[in-house]
């Protein structure tokens, strides 16, 4: 079905919707109920998110402006209007973040023995120690760069922290400008000072001073014979988006490496951050030297680059962090549960196999509450070592360093199995890591492919082929999250282990589509982008519309990271207007307006921001009291529906459908970490009534799993 584009007055600008999401992240940092070091972490996430937003989204808009493009977005704004509006929204948020760091976070940390000091606050013993540290550990790696007729303005790399200094030559009386880059990639941003030197009783747990201040107050050693008159800090963000035309690249890996080199060098400057005290005349030197526009200048009252607050999470102050969470092995995969499932006739070696459990029943996994290591990684590990397994195929979008899954794939190849890995080289900001893994896998005998021309492969799928009683049986994993051991502990994701023949055959054909010249146009059970997912999702919504029109009611529940696609939004509006009840749980961007009388009054939207990043996608359709439920890798965005390879699988087991419905209920009833989207597009955080019980979905899920209650 083809839907008309949604009217601009009914569509929220995606960039502003993203800023609203990041504002909710910042709110976690500002919330005094958040443990103190977790506040620092959320502040760091806010900054890191903002860096990527400028490197990709703002860079794209600036490129459009420079190209003279005036075409409006779905909400009716030109690229230039979007840039100006983005700035207006960001400035107060950045001020809130800095205000929180200066006035709250630093002071509260002192109460727990953590002193984040300015250089000028150090006592004489501490200054002596830090100055000696500068000479031995910092000074040798610094390179001061002067700017004059013989020395053009130096290149300033992306996300680098720098000192702009004005120095005076006493002999000539001439003032010169110089730039010093802070070596923050090789030296910690906060330089720790031995607590014994503080003279404070009781002794601090941790005393540190910002690295850039250590350098700034020792500049005289970099410019002997010169007088340091002024110094100021600045930070640069450059265009870091890689857009490669696959058809023009004979060797995609080579093209990616060239693109990564360009990224390291950096594209056009898209943001210049300076400390608030920098005078305009110095700002103008930077603007001229780096060809920056005035509207890209951000004055910051405080430390630049607060993403480095991530480092505070390493402090041994567990009482200032969320309680540690270690997931459990999925009950059906635990050894005691397996023993109950097995027939007495089954041999001991078969009892040990995860495949025997999957054959009996689909397994629905929920991370991080259920361990990734004892489910997905165990699935791959057993496949690698099982002599009956003939082949393994997997899609890799983002994976972790020292990945157990990579190790298992290599081991499988060494055992003589047919192993194929699709490594998506275009996974943004993981391109370099994926290139290294691709080469490592190839050297180990794994067949490595890079996907379909013109598409990014985002699906999370594994296919294992096993020889059983003179026949081949396939086992599959289809998930919502990456095969990444680290993020599996931090993100909420779902996965399905199954041996259903129709799913297995669909995955065989999907991998053929990814690795060969297959032009598969239909699948039995999977919804696959860009082939069947858009049409399938539209059909499911249209069916609810038809039920509502015929008086049978209609109900849609969906959980995702983002809802941006205008055609899907238009259909949801239509569904609301005929009485379909629509409940959406959307962590990030949402471009529809809910709750508008006579238009979208049957649509509600909440966003959950908690200790775990909500990453799972669930699509639930009432279907006249015969629910259909899907999970998978896709959000409802044009890129996911049309420009990526995605896979969404139906959930077939009735108790697993019920489990996902209970899960959605938990999220919808959250009154602590849920934000209600208002009819004007803004969000309000829910607050539990003083006399009511607090419901935090993520904490409730931790508690339920610890009690052994969930059964899927």
Curated annotation (Swiss-Prot):
InterPro entries: PP_kinase, PP_kinase_C_1, PP_kinase_middle, PP_kinase_middle_dom_sf, PPK_C_dom2, PPK_N_dom, PPK_N_dom_sf. Pfam families: PP_kinase, PP_kinase_C, PP_kinase_C_1, PP_kinase_N. Its cofactor is Mg(2+). The active site is at residue 458. An intermediate of this reaction is the autophosphorylated ppk in which a phosphate is covalently linked to a histidine residue through a N-P bond. GO terms for biological process: polyphosphate biosynthetic process. Its EC number is 2.7.4.1. GO terms for cellular component: polyphosphate kinase complex. It catalyses: [phosphate](n) + ATP = [phosphate](n+1) + ADP. ATP binds at residues 49, 491, 587, 615. SUPFAM superfamilies: Phospholipase D/nuclease, PHP14-like, PPK N-terminal domain-like. Keywords: ATP-binding, Kinase, Magnesium, Metal-binding, Nucleotide-binding, Phosphoprotein, Repeat, Transferase. Belongs to the polyphosphate kinase 1 (PPK1) family. NCBIfam families: poly_P_kin, PRK05443.1-1, PRK05443.1-2, PRK05443.2-2. This is Polyphosphate kinase. It comes from Prochlorococcus marinus (strain MIT 9313). The lineage of its organism: Bacteria, Bacillati, Cyanobacteriota, Cyanophyceae, Synechococcales.
């Amino acid at each position: 079905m083809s839907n008309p584009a949604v009217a601009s007055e009914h569509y929220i600008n995606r960039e502003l919707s993203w800023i609203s999401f990041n504002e909710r992240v910042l709110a976690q940092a500002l919330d005094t109920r958040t443990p103190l070091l977790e506040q620092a972490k959320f502040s760091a996430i806010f900054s890191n998110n903002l860096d990527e937003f400028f490197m990709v989204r703002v860079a794209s808009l600036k490129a459009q402006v420079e190209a003279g493009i005036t075409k409006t977005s779905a909400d009716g704004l030109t690229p230039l209007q979007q840039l100006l509006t983005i700035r207006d929204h960001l400035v107060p948020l950045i001020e809130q973040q800095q205000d929180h760091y200066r006035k709250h976070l630093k002071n509260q940390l002192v109460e727990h023995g953590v002193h984040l000091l300015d250089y000028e606050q150090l006592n004489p013993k501490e200054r002596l120690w830090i100055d000696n540290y500068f000479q031995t550990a910092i000074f040798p790696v610094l390179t001061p760069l002067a700017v004059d007729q013989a020395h053009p303005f130096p290149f300033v790399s992306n996300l680098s922290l720098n000192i702009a200094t004005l120095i005076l030559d006493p002999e000539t009386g001439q003032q010169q400008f110089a730039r010093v880059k802070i070596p923050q990639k090789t030296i910690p941003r906060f330089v720790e000072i031995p607590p014994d030197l503080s003279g404070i009783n009781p002794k601090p747990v941790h005393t540190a001073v910002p690295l850039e201040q250590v350098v700034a107050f020792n500049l005289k050693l970099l410019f002997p014979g010169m007088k340091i008159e002024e110094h100021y800090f600045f930070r640069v963000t450059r265009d870091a988006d890689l857009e490669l035309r696959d058809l023009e690249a004979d060797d995609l890996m080579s093209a990616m490496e060239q693109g990564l080199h360009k990224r390291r060098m950096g594209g056009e400057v898209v943001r210049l951050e300076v400390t608030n005290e920098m005078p305009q005349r110095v700002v103008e030197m930077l603007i001229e030297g780096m060809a920056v526009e005035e509207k890209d200048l951000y004055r910051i009252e405080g430390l630049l680059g607060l993403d480095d607050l991530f480092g505070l999470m390493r402090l041994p102050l567990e009482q200032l962090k969320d309680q540690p969470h270690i997931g459990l092995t999925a009950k059906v995969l635990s050894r005691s549960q397996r023993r109950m499932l097995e027939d007495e006739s089954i041999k001991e070696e078969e009892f040990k196999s995860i495949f025997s459990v999957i054959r009996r029943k689909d397994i629905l996994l929920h991370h991080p509450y259920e361990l990734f290591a004892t489910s997905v990684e165990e699935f791959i590990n057993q496949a690698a070592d099982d002599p009956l397994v003939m082949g393994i195929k997997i899609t890799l979008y983002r994976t972790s360093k020292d990945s157990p899954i990579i190790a298992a794939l290599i081991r499988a190849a060494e055992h003589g199995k047919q192993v194929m890995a699709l490594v998506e080289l275009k996974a943004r900001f993981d391109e370099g890591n994926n290139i290294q893994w691709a080469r490592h896998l190839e050297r180990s005998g794994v067949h490595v492919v890079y996907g379909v021309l013109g598409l990014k492969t985002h699906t999370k799928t594994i296919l294992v082929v096993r020889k059983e009683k003179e026949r081949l049986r396939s086992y599959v994993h289809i998930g919502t999250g990456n095969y990444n051991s680290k993020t599996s502990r931090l993100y909420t994701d779902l996965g399905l282990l199954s041996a259903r023949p129709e799913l297995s055959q669909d995955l065989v054909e999907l991998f053929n589509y990814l690795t060969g010249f297959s032009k598969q146009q239909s699948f039995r059970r999977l919804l696959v982008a860009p082939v069947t997912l858009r049409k399938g999702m539209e059909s499911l919504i249209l069916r609810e519309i038809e039920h509502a029109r015929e008086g049978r009611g209609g109900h849609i529940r969906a959980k995702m990271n983002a809802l941006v696609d205008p055609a899907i939004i238009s259909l949801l509006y239509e569904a609301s207007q005929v009485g379909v009840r629509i409940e959406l749980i959307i962590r990030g961007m949402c471009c529809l307006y809910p709750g508008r009388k006579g238009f979208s009054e049957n649509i509600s939207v909440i966003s959950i921001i908690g200790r775990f990043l909500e990453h799972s996608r669930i699509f639930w359709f009432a279907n006249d009291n015969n629910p259909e439920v899907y999970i998978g890798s896709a959000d409802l965005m044009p890129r996911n529906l049309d420009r990526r390879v995605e896979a969404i699988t139906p959930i077939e087991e009735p108790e697993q459908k019920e489990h996902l419905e209970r899960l959605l209920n938990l999220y919808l009833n959250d009154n602590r970490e849920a934000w209600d989207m208002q009819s004007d597009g803004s969000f309000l955080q829910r607050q539990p009534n003083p006399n009511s019980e607090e419901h935090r979905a993520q904490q409730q899920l931790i508690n339920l799993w610890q009690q052994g209650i969930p059964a899927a």
